Regions:
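Hydrophobic/aromatic-rich structural module bridging two neighboring secondary-structure elements via a short loop
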Residues: 42-90
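A short, structured loop/turn motif at beta-sheet edges
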Residues: 27-29, 54-59, 120
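N-terminal ordered "arm"
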Residues: 4-49
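Hydrophobic/aromatic beta-strand elements that line small-molecule binding cavities or substrate pockets
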Residues: 22-25, 49-53, 144, 167-169
């Protein structure tokens, strides 16, 4: 039997584009599960649903994404296995060096890195990610850096996919 130690619902509204996200998060002794729906009303708009399963250290075990936009349904399954990352069941050796996953349309992925970042100002974490474009569900290797500026501010720096993009993220005690 798994004990549920924390269960919450979080809403995010995008500031850069028109859209919102509803995320249900459950934390148990065995790990974390995040299920979410993202709605984007930019352009033709789209809906993205995901089911993200994490281990007790907040590292991705699996991530299933379902995208609906312009009358087209897309699906993507990412799995961490003992032999490496699988994308829709196929091993991707080009992703062997990555630490975790980043979806372009959700701030939740920042939480995974921030929870592993040190608590002291100046603490820094740089690692590879599988970057998933929310519109196309394409997946590529990328690199990111997180720098703790203060207890509640973390600087995000993209080092590959959106090279040069930086943002200060205001965070609570949960990341």
């Amino acid at each position: 039997m798994t004990f549920i130690s924390d269960l919450r619902t979080v809403f995010w509204r995008r500031l850069d584009l028109q859209g919102l996200e509803k995320l249900d998060l459950s934390v148990t002794d065995d790990g974390v599960r995040a299920t979410s729906t993202i709605l984007s009303t930019e352009g033709a708009g789209f809906r993205l649903d995901y089911d993200w399963r994490l281990d007790a250290r907040w590292r991705t075990k699996s991530l299933e994404l379902k995208h609906l936009g312009e009358g087209i349904a897309r699906h993507l399954l990412i799995e961490r296995t003992a032999v490496g990352w699988l994308i829709d069941g196929l091993r991707r050796p080009d992703l062997d060096h990555v630490h975790d996953v980043d979806i372009s349309a959700t701030p939740f992925c920042n939480t995974l890195a921030i929870r592993q970042l040190g608590a002291n100002p100046g603490d820094e974490l740089t690692f590879g990610v599988i970057y998933v474009d929310a519109q196309s569900l394409s997946s590529v290797a990328s690199r990111q850096r997180y720098i703790r500026k203060s207890g509640d501010v973390v600087r995000y720096v993209d080092l590959a996919t959106a090279l040069g993009f930086e943002a200060d993220l205001c965070v609570d005690r949960d990341g």
